[in-house]
């Protein structure tokens, strides 16, 4: 099992120090690791563990409110508005670095496409005594290098991982909606929306062709197919929001590597009913979000039948309202949960 935060050693002396640390005997653990380093000053795992002990011994000290540091241009980030909504209230200021050089006493670093070459920045922050929470974005295929995790106090990331979920120091967040999509307007009722269902995007991914074949049999739908993700023929953000505002049901098939997509939360933000996918013994969205009212289907024939049934039973508007109410309540709860997670791991209160 992947254990990105654990001390990795075959040394029985260091294992003894780790056991003392796990028992809350931080002073004894520190003495043990100093003894190890007297024998071998270049023992990298012992040096790493010494930093952990030192950080725990100084954990009661009051810490500054964290600085939010972007390591890529937030203007180009689909998650910009979402990240700022979730974390804006917990940070002192925001800095755009993009050079992996700036440090702060307490810092929340937003990064993506993690590779091994980025790890020295996080190690330098760790060895400088910085408190670090990493916001790790865009690892849809779970291919990023996670070696930076061990130098962070905690990690917030999108794309829930079954393996990483076992760590209490990792908090998962939904993908959220594309920057510029959220508006303060009240959602229209189902009866005032032009389209029973709609889909805008690339149809070539996994189950999307199956979804379109099934949904095309339902009258009142609308398709805007594109050549790829964020391609030139994609709708502008305002045009896509306008389409969603006029749509009741938004089928949300998975992407190349993951069941999750921005489409789910963009549909919720516009007051639509998202239909998501699930797998046998794998209900991704319940694992990520907890109980929710969004319909989850095993096949898109099932999804199309569901839409027909909801329409015939006049149940579209009640379900739409249920999804909208859940999403309205979920967002501030997520903000509270993240604030508590940040404060607990950075000891900012």
How should each PLM-predicted stretch be described?
Residues 305-326:
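Conserved donor-nucleotide binding/catalytic region of nucleotide-linked donor-dependent transferases
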Residues 59-265, 269-292, 296, 326-346:
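Nucleotide-sugar donor-binding catalytic core of glycosyltransferases
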Residues 49-50:
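Canonical tetratricopeptide repeat
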């Amino acid at each position: 099992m992947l254990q990105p935060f654990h001390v990795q050693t075959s040394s029985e002396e260091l294992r003894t120090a780790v056991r003392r640390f796990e028992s809350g005997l931080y002073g004894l653990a520190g003495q043990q690791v100093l003894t190890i380093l007297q024998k071998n000053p270049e023992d990298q795992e012992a040096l790493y563990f010494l930093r952990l002990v030192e950080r725990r011994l100084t954990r009661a000290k009051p810490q500054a409110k964290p600085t939010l540091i972007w390591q890529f241009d937030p203007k180009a980030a689909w998650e910009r508005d979402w990240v700022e909504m979730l974390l804006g209230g917990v940070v002192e200021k925001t800095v755009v670095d993009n050079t992996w050089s700036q440090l702060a006493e307490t810092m929340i670093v937003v990064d993506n496409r993690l590779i091994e070459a980025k790890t020295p920045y996080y190690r330098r922050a760790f060895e400088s005594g910085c408190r670090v929470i990493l916001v790790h974005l865009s690892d849809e295929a779970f291919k990023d290098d996670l070696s930076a995790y061990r130098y962070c106090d905690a990690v917030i990331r999108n794309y829930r991982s079954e393996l990483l979920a076992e760590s209490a120091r990792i908090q998962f967040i939904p993908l959220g909606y594309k920057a510029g999509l959220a508006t303060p307007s009240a959602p229209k009722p189902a009866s005032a929306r032009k389209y029973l269902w709609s889909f805008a995007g690339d149809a070539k991914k996994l189950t999307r062709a199956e979804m379109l074949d099934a949904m095309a049999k339902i009258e009142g739908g609308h398709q805007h197919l594109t050549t790829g993700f964020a391609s030139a023929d994609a709708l502008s953000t305002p045009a896509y929001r306008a389409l969603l505002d006029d749509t009741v049901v938004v089928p949300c098939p998975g992407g190349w590597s993951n069941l999750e997509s921005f489409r789910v939360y963009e549909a919720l933000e516009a007051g639509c009913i998202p239909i998501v996918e699930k797998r046998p013994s794998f209900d991704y969205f319940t694992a990520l979000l907890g109980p929710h009212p969004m319909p989850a289907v095993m096949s898109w024939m099932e999804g199309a039948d569901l839409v027909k049934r909801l329409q015939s039973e006049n149940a579209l508007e009640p379900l739409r309202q249920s999804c909208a109410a859940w999403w309205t309540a979920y967002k501030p709860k997520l903000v509270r949960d993240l604030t508590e997670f940040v404060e607990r791991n950075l000891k900012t209160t």
